[in-house]
Design a protein with these regions (language model features):
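Active-site and adjacent substrate-binding regions of carbohydrate-active enzymes
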Residues: 1-224
Length: 224
């Protein structure tokens, strides 16, 4: 018996890390937070690629360290996929960042810029992206509409991605502003008096009458 399963991922081992694609050169953590909340609210099971929860940017791998045959063949026009495949930084204080024994050379080089983003460093900060992901995952487990509900997109908006999740008569409107300026979203009539469903450790929106105002890289959920 086969069962269809829908996975939602922001990164994988063949594309530039979401920390660089969506976070930009300055690794905009606010943008990465709204991306994380977006992923957790989509229909399907969220699938995290190692390092997404840390906000790791794409690593710069020197030609002599490449392992990807595509990168080796097409350098420098295409630098390959090794930039998203470097070791996970577990311990920012260890010589090998907690990856391996420290006595053997890893398949790909460790990235020094990752030390400050290592698990050991982010665990110390309750407001870190890692702890935000942990809180989101725990919160999502208690939201049956997000776990099992259908999904319907709202009309296209230049700044906001919005959709409605529905399960057993319960509905959640999910709205995410992916732009660097505030945005206004016109609400469907049934959600104009809905209750705000708090996202743990995140927010960035208000409701006034028939519209929702979202801050830069803000997110907001309304529940019926």
């Amino acid at each position: 018996e086969f069962r269809r399963v829908l996975f939602r991922s922001l990164s994988n081992h063949d594309v530039v890390r979401v920390g660089s694609r969506w976070g930009g050169e300055t690794a905009n953590v606010r943008k990465l937070r709204v991306a994380a909340a977006f992923q957790m609210c989509l229909r399907g099971s969220p699938c995290l690629y190692q390092g997404d929860e840390l906000g790791l940017p794409e690593a710069q791998v020197a030609f002599e360290d490449l392992q990807d045959p595509y990168g080796i063949t097409m350098w420098p026009e295409f630098k390959g996929r090794d930039g998203c495949r470097t070791p996970m930084p577990w311990d920012g204080q260890a010589a090998d960042m907690g990856f391996g024994s420290g006595t053997q050379k890893p398949w790909l080089p460790l990235t020094e810029a990752y030390r400050a983003l290592a698990v050991s460093e982010q665990e110390k900060d309750p407001q870190s992206l890692l702890n935000f992901y942990r809180d989101l995952l725990a919160w999502r487990k208690g939201q049956s509409v997000l776990l099992h509900g259908d999904q319907a997109l709202l009309p296209a908006h230049k700044q906001v991605m919005a959709f409605v999740r529905e399960h057993e008569g319960n509905k959640i409107l999910c709205a995410f502003n992916f732009s660097d300026s505030a945005a206004t979203l016109n609400l469907p009539a049934e959600f104009q008096s809905a209750s705000v469903l708090p996202i743990p450790g995140w927010g960035g929106g208000t409701v006034s009458g028939d519209s929702m105002q979202l801050e830069t890289y803000g997110a907001m959920l309304l529940a019926l």
